[in-house]
């Protein structure tokens, strides 16, 4: 009897988890790749995990904050661009290290200069644009 209850508990948990996980659209997936594979993002994340753990943190991540499709992407709001942040993860906070913007109309990746309130065009793998522009 205990095994049956345990089985249904595990089954129920896995069903709940699969419904709770939202998969972003194809375009958002490629926008993530554009950011994560950019030389600037790689520069910022080199050795970052070790430094975070040394300071009591758990990890870092890139998060989609807003997108042109907030209903299909796990983003917090609508924007004409794909807006990301690179953040550190601690038990009590998530400090943001950098913000990135991918503009699908201009086909350009930017790093946001928060102090001067401007976007700075940065290098990225242009081959990913072909995949981004592919209709699915």
Regions found by a protein language model. Name each.
Residues 111-136:
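C-terminal partner/receptor-binding element of secreted or periplasmic proteins
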Residues 15, 98-100, 110-112:
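Assembly/interface hotspot detector across virion components, adhesins/toxins, and nucleic-acid enzymes
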Residues 21-68:
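Short, non-transmembrane alpha-helical segments in secretory-pathway proteins
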Residues 1-24:
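Bacterial Sec-dependent N-terminal signal peptides
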Residues 57-102:
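Exposed beta-strand-loop-beta-strand "reactive/processing" segments of non-cytosolic proteins
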């Amino acid at each position: 009897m205990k095994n049956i209850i345990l089985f249904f508990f595990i089954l129920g948990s896995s069903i709940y988890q699969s419904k709770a996980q939202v998969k972003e659209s194809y375009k958002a997936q490629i926008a993530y790749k554009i950011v994560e594979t950019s030389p600037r993002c790689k520069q910022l994340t080199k050795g970052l995990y070790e430094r975070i753990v040394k300071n009591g943190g758990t990890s870092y991540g890139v998060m989609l904050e807003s997108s042109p499709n907030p209903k299909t992407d796990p983003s917090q709001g609508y924007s004409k661009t794909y807006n990301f942040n690179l953040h550190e993860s601690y038990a009590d906070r998530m400090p943001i290290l950098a913000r990135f913007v991918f503009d699908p109309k201009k086909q350009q990746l930017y790093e946001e200069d928060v102090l001067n309130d401007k976007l700075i065009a940065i290098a990225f793998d242009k081959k990913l644009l072909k995949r981004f522009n592919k209709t699915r």
